[in-house]
Amino acid sequence: EMTGPGSRRARAACALADGLAESPQETRLRLLLGRSGLPMPIAQCRVLHEGRFVARVDFGWRDRRLALEYDGLWHGEPGQFARDRERLNRLREAGWRVAFVTAADLRRPELLLCRLAAALAA
């Protein structure tokens, strides 16, 4: 049991951890989604098509075949960009739609949530 200054905040922070996020921004995105009232996606969702692995996406709504990916700065590197596009093509061929989120989107959460709500409704 943690006690002392800051222990209450530390316990609250630990309660929010899920162990699946691969970056602080993914955690911020998951917490935003949790407060939004939108259906919660599966974190680190494995996408299969005809029984074969296609990709693992940051967040996925399988029933809507919608993936949500957080794109940090490193996704703009030439080699990573090409790999990301190959992966995007595989997801689309499997019938999935992909929405991307950047740091700029997280600074405008209302717009991001409106965009996601529309994608979930489509």
Give residue spans per PLM region.
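Surface segments flanking catalytic/ligand-binding clefts of nucleic-acid enzymes
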Residues: 1-122
